[in-house]
Amino acid sequence: MNLNTLSPDPGSRPSRRRVGRGIGSGLGKTCGKGHKGQKSRAGGYHKINFEGGQMPIQRRLPKMGFKSREGRTIDEVSLGELAKLNDEVIDLVALRKAGLINNSIKDVKVILSGELTAAIKLKGLRVTKGARSAIESLGGSIEE
């Protein structure tokens, strides 16, 4: 069974009533739209956010903030993820090769999360205070 082969049981989904096919059909002439008015016309209904002519809420409220480009180039890596690597020196190149960060990342910060069992050597990465103490307590080193 695949998602693209699923279909409802025969007869469980009645077909849509066709409109404008004579008085006897129950939906002839005005096709269920009543007489005159904007909603009876072709293409005739207001936009999704139209509020009857008053100033819409998305224009009444001020614009706020922006998305920092800086945030898109920095990433966090946990000690638990670094423990799985078996490289001698862990730097940006090693993290890219391991698939922990993508090519757009220019800077990485190591955070204290997960379990570290062996000493590791970091090069050119930012490190939090907690992660620094955990690495140094196991005999690891950090080069700036």
UniProtKB/Swiss-Prot annotation:
One Gene Ontology term from the biological process aspect of the record: translation
Entry superkingdom: Bacteria
Any single GO CC term annotated in Swiss-Prot or TrEMBL for this entry: cytosolic large ribosomal subunit
Example of a GO MF term: rRNA binding
A Pfam family matched in the record: Ribosomal_L27A
Record carries keyword Ribosomal protein: yes
Keyword tags: Ribonucleoprotein, Ribosomal protein, RNA-binding, rRNA-binding
Ranges where the record places region Disordered: 1-45
Amino acid composition bias (Gly residues), ranges on this chain: 21-31
InterPro entries attached to this UniProt entry: Ribosomal_uL15, Ribosomal_uL15/eL18, Ribosomal_uL15/eL18_sf, Ribosomal_uL15_bac-type, Ribosomal_uL15_CS
Record-linked PROSITE patterns: RIBOSOMAL_L15
Protein's job: Binds to the 23S rRNA.
PANTHER family per UniProt: 50S RIBOSOMAL PROTEIN L15, LARGE RIBOSOMAL SUBUNIT PROTEIN UL15M
Subunit annotation: Part of the 50S ribosomal subunit.
Family: Belongs to the universal ribosomal protein uL15 family.
Record-given protein name: Large ribosomal subunit protein uL15
Organism from which the protein derives: Legionella pneumophila (strain Corby)
